[in-house]
Amino acid sequence: MSNIIKYKKKILNGDLLTKEEVEELLEEDITDLAATANEIRESLCGNKFDLCTIINGKSGRCQENCKYCAQSAHFDTDIIEYNILNSDRIMNSAISNYNKGVHRFSVVTSGRALNNNEVDTLCKTYLKLKETCSIRLCASHGLLKYEDLKRLKDSGVTRYHNNLETSRKFFTKICTTHKYDDKIETIKNAKKAGFEICSGGIIGLGETMEDRIDMAFTLRELSVESVPVNILNPIKGTPLENQEILSYEEIIKTLALFRFILPTVQIRLAGGRTIISDKGKKALESGVNGAISGDMLTTLGIETSEDIKMIKNLGFEV
């Protein structure tokens, strides 16, 4: 019996794989690995697909030095900078996306964390949205304190996003202005405040497959509900502008392994799909059951209507 079949049976019996068992899958055929990851997804998660969109609610001038990010003030990138968007702009975007068939909507803001006035402003917007539209609200506002997280929760936000980005070991190679434990503390505080958690990372930063596996196990320990997987789209002006883009095989292998490690979570194909050949179609058949649609924060994405058509053609329910 191959390791793929053996470990599929173990997972479907309700057990979790160890890191050593996952490492045994590294040399398996990628096509078989992806197909089996998809079978695990279908057995444990069904065919329901979770589709979300984001809006860049505050852009640029970030004091953090994440090497991949166009919004860092440490690097010379050609992006538009602005403070918190007004309520009407955010609400119009949320309602428009809801009418297109999107399930979730997230406001994402640059910077280490919002200040009190910014939290106040967005809480008012979230309350208005909750009263106006049935789209599920998510938020990504950095390393907030518990008290601010609780205010967001009380305003109608149901899921908080904070990416680990990579493994603990590799993190200091991409960011030195905050610590891995700052992220974990924020995630734990968000859970304490009553949020579901969306946390994943970026692949293609120069990390190894071992780093990706380590990150996935940390996410499993944190019991997150949604794991967005971004593919680095190198931005001119950042230290990673010349980083080699991952092969599609490496992307598919990573997604499939994540399903073996995280059998019941939403694995969400996120930024970077425009740089791969089929806009993520094969990736969506590798254990994935969620995606971010539309434009990303500082890069173009894929039109939502095009995404929904592709997702339905693959047999998912949107």
Swiss-Prot record:
Molecular function in Gene Ontology: 2 iron, 2 sulfur cluster binding; 4 iron, 4 sulfur cluster binding; biotin synthase activity; iron ion binding
The enzyme's E.C. designation: 2.8.1.6
Residue numbers binding [4Fe-4S] cluster: C62, C66, C69
Residues holding [2Fe-2S] cluster: S106, C138, C198, R268
Enzyme class, UniProt record, top EC level: transferase
Keywords: 2Fe-2S, 4Fe-4S, Biotin biosynthesis, Iron, Iron-sulfur, Metal-binding, S-adenosyl-L-methionine, Transferase
InterPro entries linked to this entry: Aldolase_TIM, BATS_dom, Biotin_synth/BioAB, Biotin_synthase, Elp3/MiaA/NifB-like_rSAM, rSAM
Reactions accelerated catalytically: (4R,5S)-dethiobiotin + (sulfur carrier)-SH + 2 reduced [2Fe-2S]-[ferredoxin] + 2 S-adenosyl-L-methionine = (sulfur carrier)-H + biotin + 2 5'-deoxyadenosine + 2 L-methionine + 2 oxidized [2Fe-2S]-[ferredoxin]
Pfam family of the protein (one): Radical_SAM
Pathway where this protein functions: Cofactor biosynthesis; biotin biosynthesis; biotin from 7,8-diaminononanoate: step 2/2
Cofactor annotation: [4Fe-4S] cluster; [2Fe-2S] cluster
Annotated Radical SAM core domain residues: 44-273
The record's free-text note on cofactor binding: Binds 1 [4Fe-4S] cluster. The cluster is coordinated with 3 cysteines and an exchangeable S-adenosyl-L-methionine.
Function: Catalyzes the conversion of dethiobiotin (DTB) to biotin by the insertion of a sulfur atom into dethiobiotin via a radical-based mechanism.
Family of this protein: Belongs to the radical SAM superfamily. Biotin synthase family.
HAMAP family: BioB (MF_01694)
Subunit architecture: Homodimer.
NCBIfam families named in the record: bioB
Protein name in UniProt: Biotin synthase
Organism in which the protein naturally occurs: Clostridium botulinum (strain Okra / Type B1)
